[in-house]
C-alpha cells in the first residue's frame, strides 16, 4: 500500500522500524537510510523473515539536501519518517518539500546555533502551500 523512507538507524529508529514492519499491510515497503549503511543492513537482516514488508537500505547524508532529494526521487516514497538528529530536520523537510513527499518527525527541531522561533512559521506556511501539512494543532497553539 505505501512506501516509507525512514531516515536514521539509531535506537529510536530501530524501535520505529520494528513497529512499522509489524504493520506490513500499511507499510508494504520500507527503505532504511542512514549515514552508516552497515547499521541499516544489520537491521534489515534481523527483520527479514519476521515481516512481509519489503526492506531496502541506502546510505544518505541527512545534512545534504541534494543527496536527500536524489534518494527520494529514486525511491519515490509516499512518506518520510525522520528519526535522525533534530538538527537535521530542516534539510530533510526541504528535501520533502522539493519532492512533494509527506514528512513525519518524532522530535522537535532545535536550531543548533540560534534561538529563532521564526523557522516554524516559515515551514508551516511552505507545507500548507504544498498541501503537505494537515495538522490544526499548531494553529491552536
Where are these regions (language model features)?
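Conserved N-terminal Rossmann-fold NAD(P)-binding element of oxidoreductases
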Residues: 6-10
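N-terminal Rossmann-fold NAD(P) dinucleotide-binding loop
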Residues: 13-14
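Helix N-cap at the beta1-alpha1 junction of Rossmann-like dinucleotide-binding domains, i.e.
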Residues: 36-38
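Rossmann-fold cofactor-recognition segment
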Residues: 51-63
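N-terminal glycine-rich "phosphate-gripper" loop used for MgATP/nucleotide binding
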Residues: 61-62, 78-93, 100
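Conserved Rossmann-fold cofactor-binding substructure of NAD(P)-dependent oxidoreductases
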Residues: 62-74
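Rossmann-fold NAD(P)-binding glycine/threonine-rich loop
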Residues: 108-132
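Single conserved hydrophobic/aromatic residue that forms the stacking wall/gate
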Residues: 133-141
